[in-house]
A protein has these predicted regions:
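A generic structural signal for residues embedded in beta-strands
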Residues: 73, 121-122, 263
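Short, surface-exposed secondary-structure boundary micro-motifs
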Residues: 76, 124-125, 266
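FNR/FR-type flavoprotein reductase catalytic core
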Residues: 105-252
């Protein structure tokens, strides 16, 4: 008889997290034949050598999904668990869309899967959903693959009557993601590239500062690499504009029990998985966050190198 997941988990510092008795995606009483048909990849699109999109069949998760939440997946029974923000969801079709950048062993292993392949575990929706309400004029700034998780948030903000100004940023035009999708749900779209190959030749913070200086901005969402979110928050702080960021941290269980995703917000310890992933960008200790993200780089490189040798790849494109 399978043991039930814990209802209440308590990390070392006394934080208490309430989690569902059976999180969506937790397998109970399924046969091998049933499991082989679960979490099937229905579609796959490659945007570059390293960035790809997968549409996963997960009806129980899709029906409960809200903007800002994430999933944790595992490719096979021996694989690691990785968190990925939900880029889109279709409740009627029962699908979840994820956008992935292949940077380590697991994301490159996932990159080799295509239509018809299945995942061993796909758990969610996790995290606190975005607070979607009409506030006025909202800037949604997405950097790199951060455009994907900001898309459902921007869409929801537009649906409730906000004016949405979107900034889509990337290092170059080949790395721009979902520019067309963001244009469809935005009142104004600004495109920037670091090398000037498309849109404005500048960093995302330049138009962000200009918009804040002009006034009338009620809320800013910034999602992307940690450094990008750090400087977006620094840019908006002098203008007193509320700025929300979605943190991507090391994570194992997704219930607050392991403590791997802890971060400092306003001088207090928070857990990205149960307290976030969204936080006040002006309160986040980004230096600590970035340092924690780098702490396992040697081990990650060792794991990736071993995997590439195993699959016959000697050099990452």
């Amino acid at each position: 008889m399978s043991a039930q997941p814990t209802l209440c988990v308590r990390p070392a510092d006394g934080y208490t997290a309430r989690v569902p008795r059976y999180p969506l995606g937790y397998r109970r009483g399924t046969t091998q034949a049933q499991e082989e048909n679960m979490y099937k990849i229905l579609d796959r699109v490659d945007y570059s050598d390293d960035v790809y999109v997968q549409v996963i069949e997960a009806p129980a998760i899709a029906v409960a999904c809200q903007p800002g939440q994430f999933i944790i997946l595992r490719i096979d029974e021996e694989g690691e668990r990785i968190p990925l923000t939900i880029a889109d969801f279709d409740r009627e079709a029962g699908t979840i869309t994820i956008v992935v950048q292949a940077v380590g062993k697991t994301t490159r292993q996932l990159q080799r899967l295509g239509r018809g392949d299945s995942l061993a575990n796909f758990i969610g929706p996790l995290g606190i959903p975005s607070e979607i309400e009409k506030v006025g004029t909202v800037i949604c700034a997405g950097g790199g693959i951060g455009v994907a998780p900001i898309y459902p948030i921007a869409r929801a903000l537009k649906d409730v009557g906000n004016k949405v100004i979107s900034i889509v940023a990337a290092r170059n035009q080949n790395l721009l993601l979902w520019e067309d999708r963001m244009a469809e749900i935005s009142d104004e779209l600004i495109v920037t590239t670091d090398d000037g190959s498309r849109g404005r030749h500048c960093l995302v913070t330049e138009p962000l500062k200009e918009l804040c200086e002009a006034g009338g901005i009620d809320l800013v969402y910034a999602i992307g690499p940690g450094v990008m979110m750090k400087f977006c928050a620094k840019t908006t702080q002098p203008y007193g504009v509320k700025t929300l960021v979605s943190l991507n941290s090391i994570m194992v269980d997704g219930t607050g029990m392991c403590g791997a995703c802890r971060c400092s917000v306003g001088g207090q310890t928070k857990f990205v998985c149960v307290d976030g992933p969204e936080f006040d960008g002006h309160q986040v200790d980004f230096d600590q966050l970035l340092a924690r993200q780098r702490q396992y780089l040697p081990q990650e490189k060792e794991s990736l190198d071993a995997y590439l040798v195993n699959v016959g790849v000697t050099k990452v494109a």
